[in-house]
Amino acid sequence: MINYKVIPLGEILNKEYDVQLIEQAFKEFSCQRETDLENFLIQKAIPYEKTNYGKTHLIIDEDKLKNEGKFVVAAYFTIAQNSIDISQLSGKKKRKMLGAYPGRDSLNSIPSYLIGQLGRCDAYSGKELSGQQILDECYHAISIAARVVGGNLLIVECRECMYDKFYEKKGFKKLYDELSDEGLYTLYQKI
């Protein structure tokens, strides 16, 4: 298990860090199974942060930072606000998903938190930094927002294999049984 520190990207950008060093660390992040994670970190994380569209949290290898002075992204997650379309859900599914939410049967959409990205660098094993640890850090960040603005629904989109291997075991349920046009399941979880 590695020693790590979770640092919101916004805090790094607001301080006098060398943005080129941060961008270089992003380029060194590798996730061969989900190259979307690599692309997002390199191309979109900073613009999303600057526009407040989504907030990225970096899980930094603290030992490499202290001992080698090297900024290494071991994992990261991005969270955002979202509105999810529930107009096609049955009344039963809405009740199951929303419980006693006021006016739930007539709602067409509902606010939620979105995990837009969540992943670990290939340089780290699941024993060094587990998916559960990353997810727990994500839950913690969302819980801070939920205490301020409310909300109790979490959404994530994932490939079929990740639903079977990870998210189903973590209590996520399919919003729709079929895959989207992009080949993704939309999953939800109450928080």
Task: Explain the meaning of each model-derived region.
Residues 1-126, 133-155, 159, 164-191:
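Non-catalytic substrate-recognition and accessory regions of acyl/acetyltransferase enzymes
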